[in-house]
C-alpha cells in the first residue's frame, strides 16, 4: 500500500516571487504520491490572497475541494462564497474559467485536482498545457512556460514567405 498523505497536515510553502495578492502557500501532492495522470495541490490562502488570476484550461479539467474556511469563487456566472466540503469541477474551455480568492478574515485551505494532458513534448516527455487568461488577453503554453498576448497573434504564413 502507498503511504497515505494527510491533506489537512501536509506542509505548504510560499513563493517568494509571488506578487501582492497572490502569496498563497502550496504543496504539490502528485509527486509525493507518485501520481502520473492526476495532479493535486493543497493551497493555503491568507485573507486577501488568490491562488492565481482568472483563467481557464484548454487541455485539462480541474476540480476544487474546500477543506477549511470560506473562499470566494469567481466563475463566468459571478462570485460565490464557498464552504468547507464544497466540491466543484471546472471543465475545459471558457465555461470552466475560475479564480479562488480569500475575502474572509481567516485562512482558507483548498485542494485543486487536475487531469494531466496526454499530449507531451517529444524531447522531454513533459505534458502540454494551454491556459487562457481572459482578463489580461493572455494565453500560456507549458512547457516552456511562456505567456503571449492573444492580440499579438500573427497569420499562419507570417515569417514563412
Residue ranges and their predicted role:
Residues 1-37, 131-161:
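A short, N-terminal "cap"/entry segment at the start of jelly-roll beta-barrel domains
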Residues 42-46, 57-73, 113-117:
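Short, conserved beta-strand element in jelly-roll/cupin
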Residues 51, 61, 68-70, 77, ...:
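A generic structural motif
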Residues 52, 80, 129-131:
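Short beta-strand segments
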Residues 115-130:
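Intrinsically disordered, low-complexity coil segments
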Amino acid at each position: 500500500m502507498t503511504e497515505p498523505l494527510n491533506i489537512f497536515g501536509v506542509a505548504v510553502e510560499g513563493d517568494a516571487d509571488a506578487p501582492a495578492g497572490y502569496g498563497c502557500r502550496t504543496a504539490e501532492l502528485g509527486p509525493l504520491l507518485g501520481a502520473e495522470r492526476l495532479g493535486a495541490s493543497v493551497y493555503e490562502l491568507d485573507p486577501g490572497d488568490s491562488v492565481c488570476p482568472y483563467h481557464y484550461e484548454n487541455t485539462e479539467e480541474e476540480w476544487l475541494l474546500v477543506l477549511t474556511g470560506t473562499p470566494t469563487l469567481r466563475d463566468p456566472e459571478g462570485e460565490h462564497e464557498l464552504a468547507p466540503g464544497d466540491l466543484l469541477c471546472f471543465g475545459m474551455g471558457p465555461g470552466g474559467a475560475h479564480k479562488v480568492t480569500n475575502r474572509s478574515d481567516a485562512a482558507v485551505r483548498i485542494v485543486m485536482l487536475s487531469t494531466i494532458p496526454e499530449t507531451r513534448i517529444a524531447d522531454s516527455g513533459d505534458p502540454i498545457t494551454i491556459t487562457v487568461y481572459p482578463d489580461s488577453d493572455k494565453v500560456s503554453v507549458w512547457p516552456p512556460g511562456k505567456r503571449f498576448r492573444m492580440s499579438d497573434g500573427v497569420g499562419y504564413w507570417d515569417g514563412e514567405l
